Amino acid sequence: MQKKVTIYTDGACSGNPGKGGWGALLMFGSVKRELSGYSPATTNNRMELMAAIQALEALKEPCEVALYSDSSYLVNAINKGWLKRWTSNNWKTAAKKPVENIDLWKMILELIRLHSVTFHKVKGHSDNEFNNRCDYLATQAIKNNR
């Protein structure tokens, strides 16, 4: 039986594009682990994806994951089938334009094949303490350039 892990993620950007940061909170039972990172030149969407990637990569074995994000871009791509359509359309959108951030989407595809992941949308900058913590981690990563 796989371990059940809850993950919250958030990405932030100072300017879009601009300096970016991401934050993640992984929870397994009573254990909590915080992760964050920085990029000197990026976009908000890339940081949202990177938060999910880094959190899933931090898992040491295949897990059952509930991943919570305030990013409609991330959650809708999975839950509304956009990612599946993009891959079957040779990485083209419904408008026949190239999908942005293909490198990161390919990483997410690999990770969701390894783990059993369900994606959940949460309201950003609201009263969700875990999402707010990830936002803090992401903005601090930008502030501290690391």
UniProtKB/Swiss-Prot annotation:
Asked whether the keyword Nuclease is assigned, the reply is: yes
- Write down the EC number: 3.1.26.4
Family from the record: Belongs to the RNase H family.
Q: Where in the cell is it found?
A: Cytoplasm
Record Pfam families: RNase_H
Report residues binding Mg(2+) 1.
Answer: 10, 48, 70
Q: How does it assemble?
A: Monomer.
* Identification of the protein by name: Ribonuclease H
Q: Which PROSITE patterns match?
A: RNASE_H_1
Residues annotated as domain RNase H type-1:
1-143
What PANTHER family does its record include?
RIBONUCLEASE H1
**Where's it mainly located?**
cytoplasm
Q: Which gene encodes it?
A: rnhA
Residues that hold Mg(2+) 2 according to the record? 10, 135
